[in-house]
Amino acid sequence: MDSIIQNDTERCFLCGMIGYVEPLDKHHVFGGALRKKSEEYGLTVYLHHSRCHIFGDNSVHKNARINRKLQAFAQKKAMDHYGWSVEDFIKEFYKNYL
């Protein structure tokens, strides 16, 4: 499914720069066992591979604060998009990130 969070898949969701600066990766906001649900519900964003996704100081995989902010933002988007309550979201993703 297309992302319900990000329309412009040619720009990094975190820094806003175009992908030609560095390749973009599709990041599933809720990973691990919830990766398929992230895909199913469109909870994905595009991030610069090194700087914003994996290795940078402010990348989602190295900076827990940034990752949690993205998860909270994605939860709000999902609740708005699907008309879910917090309880509905927890039924799908097992946790409240707000």
What do the PLM-derived regions correspond to, one by one?
Residues 22-25, 43-47, 74:
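Amphipathic alpha-helical interface surfaces
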Residues 33, 64, 72:
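Small/polar glycine-rich anion-binding or flexible loop at a beta-alpha turn
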Residues 30-44:
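Short linker/helix segments within small regulatory modules
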Residues 24-32, 49-55:
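Histidine-centered catalytic micro-motifs
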Residues 1-25, 50:
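Short cysteine-rich loop/turn motifs with clustered Cys
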Residues 1-7, 65, 96-98:
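Short, Lys/Arg-enriched, disordered terminal segments
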Residues 44-69:
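Short Cys/His-centered divalent metal-binding micro-motifs
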Residues 71-98:
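Short flanking/linker segments adjacent to small metal-binding domains or redox-active Cys/His motifs
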